[in-house]
Amino acid sequence: MKRAFILVLDSFGIGATADAKEFGDVGSDTLGHIADQCEQGLANNDQRQGALRLPNLSKLGLAMAHKESTGRFAPGLDADAEIIGAYGHAAELSSGKDTPSGHWEIAGVPVLFEWGYFTDKANSFPKELTDRILARAGIDGFLGNCHASGTQVLDDLGEEHMKTGQPIFYTSADSVFQIACHEETFGLDRLLELCQIAREELADYNIGRVIARPFIGPGKGQFERTGNRRDLSVEPPSATVLQKLAEEKQGQVVSIGKIADIYANCGITKKVKATGIPALFEATLEQIKQAGDNTIVFTNFVDFDSAYGHRRDVAGYAAALEYFDGRIHEVMELMQEDDILILTADHGCDPTWPGTDHTREHIPVLVYGQKVPAGSLGRRETFADIGQTLASYFGTSPMDYGKNFL
């Protein structure tokens, strides 16, 4: 019986890529810089103290993969751990350092075209675009129209939004159009309808995602985003390994978290909603228990990126990594003889880096299974090696990009 479990630690980069200079990210290193801060006692909070401890991920080869990527061991990680899995680091072939590009490339389809972007920091959106969106939605105006941090924009504009009923439109360095609205005063269904209108009106702009950012709270300093985020993505430009498994092998692809949104539901046969790392873990364990032959269980742990990476919260990121490390054995204990587990990421988001954007980094490729030989996979030239490996494992037609590493 063939089953694969893919766990994406969203934004967990392990060192800058050779092309990082093109993105302003030379020297970025999500794992390494978190470990440095922990070692120096600068990442303590009520959940964790001291050096970064990831014993289980180190056994799976994380410390070695980081060493091969950067030339140094991350402090605190066990450099002498007995390795029980295959490990490597992968560079990105795609033109961007965004979530869809990273995930699509993982599934064998790199993004070789350029996304559209809203590059102006203020007055970011063309008036003709916003006029059409507002007219279709029956709304008399909007707030924002700028590049913004998702949490800061709520403090800046949340109260005005509640008073006026006008949605908050904002963007970032990624190919995104984000809409923040209060779940209670504006309404979640109304927000999702507005996002669908925006998705349709953005067809000619080549924007990767429209993101619904619902929030709650009575006022400034008390607003918080809810778990009802939705990502409305465009479809991948060609069939991913997920689609090939579903169509060629009548297999099952179980999306946990925001995976289905990222792939615009293409190739997804079952969707499981969960919010927060503990709930995502529980959902993953439950779906593994239920999984039959020719099944991929695919989970995105978005909080590493959204709650800690973008917010530049080193201590929070470290605590989340240690929590994840403490539970990964639960997945491994459910694995059968032919199963494979792949731990990876979609880009970096170094919480010590200037700004709030993603960073262009290698991603870890950690592979475990009873039949997977332990040892180095070296540097992989594309994330698509993961997709090609899955295509070979499940016996689908090959992908156009990537090399099988098993």
Swiss-Prot record:
- Please state which protein family the record places this protein in: Belongs to the phosphopentomutase family.
Supply the gene name: deoB
Q: Which GO terms describe its biological process?
A: 2-deoxyribose 1-phosphate catabolic process; 5-phosphoribose 1-diphosphate biosynthetic process; metabolic compound salvage; nucleotide metabolic process
Recorded GO cellular component terms are: cytosol
Cofactor annotation comment: Binds 2 manganese ions.
Statement: the UniProt record of this protein carries the keyword Metal-binding: yes
Recorded catalytic activity of this chain's protein: 2-deoxy-alpha-D-ribose 1-phosphate = 2-deoxy-D-ribose 5-phosphate; alpha-D-ribose 1-phosphate = D-ribose 5-phosphate
Q: Which InterPro entries has this protein been placed in? A: Alkaline_phosphatase_core_sf, DeoB, Metalloenzyme, Phosphopentomutase_DeoB_cap_sf
Name used for this protein in its record: Phosphopentomutase
User: Which organism does this sequence originate in?
Assistant: Vibrio vulnificus (strain YJ016)
Intracellular or extracellular location(s): Cytoplasm
Which Pfam families does the UniProt record give?
Metalloenzyme (PF01676)
Q: What class of enzyme is it?
A: isomerase
User: Mind listing the GO molecular function terms for this protein?
Assistant: magnesium ion binding; manganese ion binding; phosphopentomutase activity
Q: What is its main location?
A: cytoplasm
